[in-house]
Every structure is written in C-alpha cells, then in structure tokens.
C-alpha cells in the first residue's frame, strides 16, 4: 500500500489539460447490405466465373477469423450461388492458427460471426489436418487444409486491407488467405518462422504455389471504408490474382481511417481488443508497430490504454506497445489467450505488460509526466475510443486553434476537464 501511494504521489502533481470533442470527416462510399447478394451474383454470373462452377462439383469456400462487415452474408451468397449451379458448397475455416489452433475452436470463431451451417445451408468442415499439394519456387513443401485440397474447387472469400506488421504488394488479402489461412497452423508457422522481414516475399511465394497446385477457381474480395462498412466487392479469377490484388490493396489504403492530426505527446486509447484489430489496436492508426517493416499512423511519444473490449475476452494483445495502462486492464488479462498467437507469429512485444497504474487519471498522468521536450502545462493529447471507430475523438486544448480551420475536422464542444470520478476513473 505504501509503495502504491508513493507511485501515485510521483505523478499526482501533473495537471491534465482540458479536452474538446471533434468529428473527423472521411469519404464514405458504401454498399448497402441488401445490395450485396445482387452484386456478388452479378459478378459470378459472368461467363469467366460461371464456367468454373459445374454441376456435381464439391466446392470449398474460405471463411476467416476477422470481424469483417457482412461476412456471413457474403459467405452465404457465395454458397447459394454454388448451389444454383448444381454444385455442392461447403465452408472451411481459413485462419492459420487462430481459434486456439483447434478444429472446434475455429468453427466456434465462425459461429461467433453468424457463419453457421443453419444460416449458410451448407456444411462447415473444420479440421487442422493439412495435405501437401506441391512445392513453391524455392522447393519448400506447400500444405493446405485437407478438405480444401480434396475439393473439386476452392473459392477464396476474404477482405483486402493493409497489414499491421509488413508492407508489400500483397498484405492482408487473397494471397495471405491462401498462404496462411488455408495453410492452417503449418502455413502460419512456416511463414512466420521467416519473420515479418520476409513476409512480403513468403506470402505471394506460397500463394502462387497454391494457385498452381490447388483447385483455386476464383476469389471474392471485399474492401471496407473508414467506418468498417463494405464499400467495394471484387471477383478475381485465379489466373488474375497475381496481377489484380496489388491495385485493390492500394485502393484499400485510400479508405483507411486515420487520426487527422499528425502527432501528439500522448495518445489515449479507451479500449483495445481483437474485435478492433488482430493487433488489439491497429498500428496503421496508432503508430504502434510490432516490427520495423511497416510504418504509418500518428506519431505519439506515449500511448495509454484504459480498458479491454468485452468482445476480446481478456486477450490483451497489443498492450505491450503501450507506455502505461490501468489496474482495470491488468485484472482482465487472460494470458492463455494472449500468448499462443504471439508465439506462432514469433513477435512477443505485443503481449508484454507496461507500467500499471491504479486509475485512468494516473495512467494518463504518468504518460504526460514521462514525455520529453514537451510543454507539460499544455500537452498535446489525443483520445480515441479504439483504433476502428475514429469519427468522434477528443483533442486537448493545445489543438484548439490549430484545428479550427482544418477541412476534415469539426469542433463539437468547448474544452472541458475530463470527468474523472472520485477514484480517478472515467467509467
């Protein structure tokens, strides 16, 4: 108790500035959910795609572990189309080592997104077994999901977006869904063993080998806007993936939300969680990259995490890239759910535990207190709810004059002190 009070006293004299609310404006192209089935059916009815799905074929459709907008609807629409062609669809989880690296765990991940056999009207065949389908250009064995390998055709359903740990022409998208998603635990380990330094090489190298040696028919890829909504759908034939995925990734970059001020002294993140990013908080937003092979996001000297989302179930991955957190976060951590993914991807930094303070106020205070070469009486603080929802954020008074004429920022309130309760918490 004495030590606790001593630590609190070290930061108690650090005053915190007034904050004001702003609304950030981003482009918002959007496809309404009710329009999605018609768009997908329209693409797949073209001869280039329809000719690949023939009566009697058993066709595997991939489904991943990310919370993609309208993912259940997209998957069902593809399955319904396959059935309309007289073929037999089934869904395979394509998520590397996620879901606890077990068949049942991966099926449960899909069910949490509404991807169930009853909704789809077709089986979900989940297995961690893989089958060798060939070798890549460097002579390395290539394995994919056993059920997919034995199918007559594979349709890759996925989202295309920037990755959080490496840069290249193929990041999170079709190639990665094949190389790591369909590769299961084996594929994830092989690619990650080489490190993120080589990921931009390994993902397309394994992906191309899968296109050449597995019955991949085509891909149905979605892109999301800054509001986590479907804004584009693309159908890509297997033989066109190499050429057409990179431009789609470039387009996905343009739709990413961001914090419209370039830098701050302290970034306060109300919640992190796997439902916001595979990294807990998306470093493309927060600048908290786990490797030197990707960059971007806001330039913050300190990052403060106040809470975990309920949906992350104690998985505090990403916490290790913050400077300080709260006892509230510490008490929720489920290390058993945090560590497996970190071990598989060979990057341990995200599951470290930063300095733990008793309250929200103390956590923010210690971040300001330990910044170097700043005006500690008027610090530049940015507060966001999470790394996914960035329309409404808060800025400290130091930004007030600066953003008044910013074309993408609308001031929504006057500066006020944060409403800490008697324990120093915001909720």
Stretch-by-stretch model annotation:
Residues 58-60, 265, 302, 380:
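Residues that mark the start of a beta-strand
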